[in-house]
């Protein structure tokens, strides 16, 4: 008879509680804390990036999600924000400017429901019309992040200045090293 002994030992995990960096912007801090609602406003995007992580069920589909919950209207978005006790929202997509009016409505509804302290940031890769900056500021957008796709900031200069002048905290998402190396290779 063979004796089998088994030892149940679980791996030991180090409890790492990394605090957000005090230099991080408010949107980053709240995301790191897990307190921001992810508002996927549309799957539509004018770019066709081959590295886009959107699945077939979201890419080029004009539908809205709050976190992973499909939402038909902003009442459902607000319900999801309440359920998670969100302190803010990050608006993303495809590209939120492909559903500009819906993005503006979402900002207004969330601010009306949760107040001015409910922090809202939005991502875009579109160098939009500078006059739209005041519309987003008036709606209550706190922060905007531009993702340069061609590694050139020139076409974004006017809208970045307009957003900043309108009181929207304005940032640029860093370009990945791989993307940068590919760009250098193609242009040399």
Model segments located where?
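Anion (oxyanion) recognition and catalysis
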Residues: 164
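Generic structural signal for well-ordered alpha-helices
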Residues: 78, 104-108, 133, 157-160
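Divalent cation-coordinating acidic motifs and surrounding scaffolds
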Residues: 74
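Canonical Radical SAM [4Fe-4S] cluster-binding loop centered on the CxxxCxxC motif
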Residues: 8-18, 24-70
């Amino acid at each position: 008879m063979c004796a089998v002994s088994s030892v149940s030992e679980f791996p030991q995990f180090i409890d790492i509680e990394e605090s957000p960096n005090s230099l991080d912007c408010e949107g980053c801090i709240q995301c790191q804390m897990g307190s921001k609602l992810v508002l996927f406003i549309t799957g539509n995007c004018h770019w066709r990036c081959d590295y886009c992580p959107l699945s077939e069920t979201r890419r080029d589909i004009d539908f809205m999600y709050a976190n992973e919950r499909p939402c038909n209207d902003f009442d459902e978005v607000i319900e999801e924000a309440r359920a998670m006790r969100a302190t803010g929202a990050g608006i993303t997509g495809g590209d939120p400017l492909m559903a500009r009016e819906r993005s503006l409505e979402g900002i207004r509804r969330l601010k009306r429901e949760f107040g001015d302290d409910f922090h809202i940031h939005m991502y875009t890769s579109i160098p939009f019309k500078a006059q739209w900056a005041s519309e987003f500021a008036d709606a209550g957008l706190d922060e905007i992040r531009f993702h340069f796709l061609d590694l050139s900031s020139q076409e974004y200069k006017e809208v970045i200045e307009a957003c900043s002048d309108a009181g929207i905290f304005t940032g640029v998402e860093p370009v990945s090293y791989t993307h940068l190396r590919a760009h250098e290779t193609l242009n040399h």
